[in-house]
Amino acid sequence: MSQEIISINQNSKIKPHLFHLVEPSPWPILISFALLVLVSGATLFMHDYRFGTYVLICGVVSVVLCLYLWWRDVIKEGIIEKQHTTPVRAGLRIGMALFILTEIVFFGVFFASFFKASLSPVGILDGVWVVTEGIWPPLSIKTFDPFDIPFINTLILLLSGSTVTWAHYALEEKNQKDCITALGLTVLLGIFFTLMQAYEYHHAAFNFTDGIYASNFYLATGFHGAHVIIGTIFLIVCYFRAKRGDFTNNDNGHLGFEFAAWYWHFVDVVWLFLYTFVYVLGK
């Protein structure tokens, strides 16, 4: 009897493989609730509810905390547990590529809305929506000079794309010093872009509720600005990981930095389209 059990157990052994069987994690469900709080807080804040600000802050803090703890586990799986094998890295790359594809569709909706409004402008006359052919932007809107702050921001992002590429090449050459320097410059350029965007918003001659042009403008550039902030945080994490030697001393590659670079180049390309169509052609 005991020999049969031993035989069955031996025959039922799982063969070794290169795939990572993820252990149960609380972070997906927790970040779902955190995002619910974040979106609810943003809605309450935009409708001027008294406690909306506090709910929004709680949502932001919850999302950041969950992401930090989740990414910490992912880094541990790759660096310490060596779970990021070649097939796992290939799957992660496919996942990141699909994520960026969804982001392209996301911004494509804003561009479609902007083109629809600009190619067939409408306005309100005596309380009735009427077509105002050829008048775009609306006469009540004072647009930004595309060769002022927007042009400076374009140069900033193009330069940051060069520095993040420099960091990538430095990593490939195992040059930790140049990688850290290039990442630091990229982070500073990202922060500078965000500050310039905030300055532009502060001095804007129109607000979010001033018609279809204003709402399209703030939605498109605002979400892009949010992506720049997220990308900057992504690169800050990579900066400190590079200083710790996680990339240059890791046989499993540098997926974290690779994905941050993909994301940053995506942000650069989106801005070029925004600058061309919203700032230059939309003036």
Model regions and ranges:
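...captures the hydrophobic TM-helix bundle architecture rather than a specific catalytic motif
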Residues: 1-283
